């Protein structure tokens, strides 16, 4: 995926140049005659006969990848305790971390007597790649963090679904009509 800025006259839904096919989508006006759009590239070697379904798959896969990336490394959190208290970070929500946070949260409902606080988690890295830790003093803090993460993931999915449903497929359909 590549973000491009240019004049609307430079935008073409599908371009074939050299060894690749460029699929453009998400055209947005920025200001005056300046626009922004996203491009996805398909190697011609792997695409002997381009189809509308291949174009749709490429665009939807690109949107899915951006949603996954946003979930993975963009959950905003302000550290509550410890050396990094007050620092705004982007929490690393890998599948493993999500599972660890969920396990600790669920333990409150299944075996509350086995929960101990304070508990500490590595939640991010700073710009110098040093670990950033959060110290949860009680279940309420852990719950706010965990439920905030769940809400953030849901927001990311909703934005992706909205982006997909907002795509006008007409220019791509027209492209294939002229190719016939």
Task: Specify the residue positions occupied by each region the protein language model found.
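A preference for well-ordered globular domain cores
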Residues: 2-180
């Amino acid at each position: 995926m590549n973000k491009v800025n240019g004049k609307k006259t430079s935008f073409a839904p599908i371009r074939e140049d050299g060894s690749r096919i460029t699929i453009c989508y998400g055209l947005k006006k920025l200001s005056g005659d300046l626009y922004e759009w996203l491009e996805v590239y398909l190697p011609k070697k792997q695409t002997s006969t381009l189809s509308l379904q291949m174009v749709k798959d490429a665009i939807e896969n690109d949107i899915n990848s951006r949603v996954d990336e946003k979930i993975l490394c963009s959950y905003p959190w302000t550290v509550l305790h410890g050396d990094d208290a007050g620092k705004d970070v982007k929490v690393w929500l890998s599948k493993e971390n999500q599972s660890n946070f969920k396990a600790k949260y669920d333990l409150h409902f299944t075996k509350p007597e086995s929960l101990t606080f304070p508990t500490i988690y590595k939640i991010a890295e700073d710009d110098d790649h040093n670990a950033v830790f959060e110290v949860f003093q009680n279940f309420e803090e852990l719950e706010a963090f965990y439920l905030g993460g769940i809400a953030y993931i849901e927001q990311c999915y909703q934005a992706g679904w909205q982006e997909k449903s907002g795509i006008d497929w007409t220019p791509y359909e027209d492209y294939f009509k002229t190719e016939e």
